[in-house]
């Protein structure tokens, strides 16, 4: 059976950001994990989700997959149909080598994986969540770059309680149920045997502390939502779906941790005149039959302004010309890409008697020295001249 597209497996767009991919994976991994879902096909679906995430969350593998499809990642990973065993590392799922897989499964199962990583101290400083912002820009703004202001909403440290969540003059107290750990250990019987699972403390909600007198401004959250206005520099040469990171412009951290980052994802409007592929610009230029036959110098629009293009005598329809350095600026390099111009020979719909006579004489003078392509052209020209 043919493998499904990895983006379809996770239910995300091909231009999805890393955070969107991780969010989709977390949701599906929890939904289809064999210990949580005993429906037929859940395990196979779970393997498929893991395989898709393994490729798409890795920038190098994702780039190979985007360029070559399944052939670009064959033999580079996947889960190989391994079973799930238990969680003690005896043939079961292992998070080694998969980056934030362990964090994701920690969200689903706590520390149920035997020998897994210890849970983060809930009272330790934690970086805030990253945010995504989609910016739609015009085609030429993507080529030349610009500065523009954006306004978005993010959480900021509460100015009243300085992020503690407690009313001024009071402090959060250690939770007496979990003793500040934020988790409770629960023993349960499963088809795999008896396992101990750490779950979020139901008294403090995993914070490790309890706020007896909540701050009236943030209602005990430690953060408040505020609108933020930033000036964003759009890099010259940015392409549709690409993103930039603004450090420290995301959500507020916890327990004095740093702010998260803001990712600006660009959506570029198409142009009516130009088409783009990477750093190359494509456009068309109409020329007359006489210009194609005799040669000429024409003005061609580029993304940097009009330039002269020399048309050699005998130019054939749909001939491509390259204008070096007239393409898109290279973001991670110097200079510009190129522009490719395709000339379109335009046959006039109406001509006067003198023009008609001259063209008929030209056709007659050509004799049998007409290539099949030229013959095709002249047959269409005769039809035009004869009013057919």
Swiss-Prot record:
Organism: Lactobacillus johnsonii (strain CNCM I-12250 / La1 / NCC 533)
GO biological process: chaperone cofactor-dependent protein refolding; DNA replication; protein refolding; response to heat
Localization annotation: Cytoplasm
Protein family according to the UniProt entry: Belongs to the DnaJ family.
Superkingdom: Bacteria
Free-text cofactor note: Binds 2 Zn(2+) ions per monomer.
One of the record's GO molecular function terms: unfolded protein binding
Free-text domain note: The J domain is necessary and sufficient to stimulate DnaK ATPase activity. Zinc center 1 plays an important role in the autonomous, DnaK-independent chaperone activity of DnaJ. Zinc center 2 is essential for interaction with DnaK and for DnaJ activity.
Amino-acid positions noted as binding Zn(2+) 2 in the UniProt annotation, renumbered to this chain: 175, 178, 201, 204
J domain residues: 5-69
Known partners and oligomeric status: Homodimer.
NCBIfam families to which the protein is assigned, alphabetical: DnaJ_bact, PRK10767.1, PRK14276.1
Entry protein name: Chaperone protein DnaJ
Cofactor: Zn(2+)
Zinc fingers (CR-type) by residue: 145-227
Cited function: Participates actively in the response to hyperosmotic and heat shock by preventing the aggregation of stress-denatured proteins and by disaggregating proteins, also in an autonomous, DnaK-independent fashion. Unfolded proteins bind initially to DnaJ; upon interaction with the DnaJ-bound protein, DnaK hydrolyzes its bound ATP, resulting in the formation of a stable complex. GrpE releases ADP from DnaK; ATP binding to DnaK triggers the release of the substrate protein, thus completing the reaction cycle.
Positions with a binding annotation for Zn(2+) 1: 158, 161, 215, 218
CC terms in the record's Gene Ontology section: cytoplasm
Keyword annotations: Chaperone, Cytoplasm, DNA replication, Metal-binding, Repeat, Stress response, Zinc, Zinc-finger
SUPFAM superfamilies for the chain: Chaperone J-domain, DnaJ/Hsp40 cysteine-rich domain, HSP40/DnaJ peptide-binding domain
CXXCXGXG motif repeat placement: 158-165, 175-182, 201-208, 215-222
SMART domains, A to Z: DnaJ
Major localization listed first in the record, in broad terms: cytoplasm
């Amino acid at each position: 059976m043919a493998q499904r597209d990895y983006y379809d497996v996770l239910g995300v767009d091909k231009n999805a950001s890393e955070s969107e991919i991780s969010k989709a994976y977390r949701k599906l991994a929890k939904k289809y994990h064999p210990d949580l879902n005993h429906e037929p096909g859940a395990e196979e679906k779970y393997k498929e989700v893991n395989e898709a995430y393994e490729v798409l969350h890795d920038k190098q593998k994702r780039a190979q997959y985007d360029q070559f499809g399944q052939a670009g990642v064959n033999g580079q990973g996947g889960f190989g149909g391994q079973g799930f065993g238990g969680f003690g590392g005896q043939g079961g799922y292992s998070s080694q080598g998969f980056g934030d897989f362990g964090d994701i499964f920690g969200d689903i199962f706590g520390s149920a994986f035997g020998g897994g990583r210890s849970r983060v101290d809930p009272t330790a400083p934690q970086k805030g969540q990253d945010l995504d912002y989609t910016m739609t820009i015009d085609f030429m703004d993507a080529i030349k770059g610009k500065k523009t202001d954006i306004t978005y909403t993010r959480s900021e440290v509460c100015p009243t309680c300085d992020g503690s969540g407690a009313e001024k003059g009071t402090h959060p107290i250690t939770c007496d149920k979990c003793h500040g750990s934020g988790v409770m250990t629960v023993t349960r019987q499963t088809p795999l045997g008896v396992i101990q699972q750490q779950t979020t403390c139901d008294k403090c909600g995993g914070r490790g502390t309890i706020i007896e007198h909540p701050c009236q401004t943030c209602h005990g959250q430690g953060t408040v939502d505020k609108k933020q206005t930033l000036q964003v520099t759009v890099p010259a040469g940015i392409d549709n779906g690409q993103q930039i990171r603004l450090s420290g412009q995301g959500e507020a951290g916890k327990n004095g941790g740093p702010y998260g980052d803001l990712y600006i994802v660009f959506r570029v409007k198409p142009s009516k005149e130009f088409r783009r592929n990477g750093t190359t610009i494509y456009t068309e230029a109409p020329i007359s039959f006489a210009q194609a036959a005799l040669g000429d110098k024409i003005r061609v629009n580029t993304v940097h302004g009009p330039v002269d293009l020399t048309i050699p005598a005998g130019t054939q329809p749909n001939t491509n010309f390259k204008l070096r350095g007239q393409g898109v600026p290279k973001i991670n390099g110097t200079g510009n890409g190129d522009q490719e111009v395709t000339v379109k020979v335009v046959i006039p719909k109406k001509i006067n008697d003198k023009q008609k006579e001259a063209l008929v004489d030209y056709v007659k003078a050509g004799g049998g020295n007409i290539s099949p392509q030229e013959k095709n052209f002249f047959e269409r020209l005769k039809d035009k001249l004869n009013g057919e």
